[in-house]
Amino acid sequence: SDNEFPSGCIEFGKECDLDKGNCQCCRRNGYCSCAVN
């Protein structure tokens, strides 16, 4: 249920703001796992 979206995140665990909603970076490669509730 986790969708990976390309983001400009550099640090691990950094919060991201995407059109889909608030995403939190949980990937080392800089990808974010977006979960919209």
Swiss-Prot record:
UniProt tissue specificity: Expressed by the venom gland.
Main location: secreted
Subcellular location: Secreted
Secreted is among the record's keywords: yes
Record-linked PROSITE patterns: OMEGA_AGA_II_III
Record keywords, A-Z: Calcium channel impairing toxin, Ion channel impairing toxin, Neurotoxin, Presynaptic neurotoxin, Secreted, Toxin, Voltage-gated calcium channel impairing toxin
Pfam families: Toxin_34
Gene Ontology cellular-component annotations: extracellular region; host cell presynaptic membrane
GO molecular function: calcium channel regulator activity; toxin activity
Function: Omega-agatoxins are antagonists of voltage-gated calcium channels (Cav). They block neuromuscular transmission presynaptically.
Family from the record: Belongs to the neurotoxin 04 (omega-agtx) family. 03 (type II/III omega-agtx) subfamily.
Protein name: U1-ctenitoxin-Asp1a
UniProt source species: Ancylometes sp. (South American fishing spider)
